[in-house]
Amino acid sequence: MSRIGKMPIKLAEQAKIEIKDNVISVSGPKGNLEQRLVPEVTVDIADGQVAVTRIDDSKRSRAMHGLYRMLISNMLEGVTSGFSKKLLINGVGFRAEKKAEFLALTLGYSHMIYFKAPEEIAIECPDPTSIVVSGIDKALVGQVAAKIRSFRKPEPYRGKGIRYSDEFVRRKEGKTAGK
């Protein structure tokens, strides 16, 4: 049995969960999320806990068991406390600023990059060299943060670029002078 899938999910007091027509809906103080369920797993709600079980022992059922347990857990955490990712910008003249609904990035190109985030995602710039991406959908927060990072990935020689706050950039030594 899946080690992750067999653990029950504790239901937070503020969160409400319901299953209708093979769609699980989770609502809380931060918003609502929905996820379509696959036929390989069933979800039971009892005693303030959510249990995910699989219908058989096929390889796909075992894979979906752990996946859907974590998806539901992330949905519950998202609607109660939310998710955020912090990005740091390194480089001379590299900066970010929030302009209306756009994120304006100056990253050493001949032009500025304007990025419009999805409506469910909030982007903040506490200072010109950091960006905070937050929202209730963990996958969407990670996807938007990865998209922003892809505009200028950190390079290994000087470390210039956009990186996650918890990311370690392996540095390389430059060319050494000849004889």
From Swiss-Prot:
Highest classification ranks of the organism: Bacteria, Pseudomonadati, Chlorobiota, Chlorobiia, Chlorobiales
Keyword annotations of the record: Ribonucleoprotein, Ribosomal protein, RNA-binding, rRNA-binding
Organism: Chlorobium phaeobacteroides (strain BS1)
Any one GO molecular function term: structural constituent of ribosome
Record-annotated disulphide pairs: none
GO biological process, one term: cytoplasmic translation
GO CC, alphabetical: cytosolic large ribosomal subunit
Family, similarity comment: Belongs to the universal ribosomal protein uL6 family.
Quaternary structure annotation from Swiss-Prot or TrEMBL: Part of the 50S ribosomal subunit.
Superkingdom, taxonomy of origin: Bacteria
UniProt KW Nucleus keyword: no
The name this protein goes by in its record: Large ribosomal subunit protein uL6
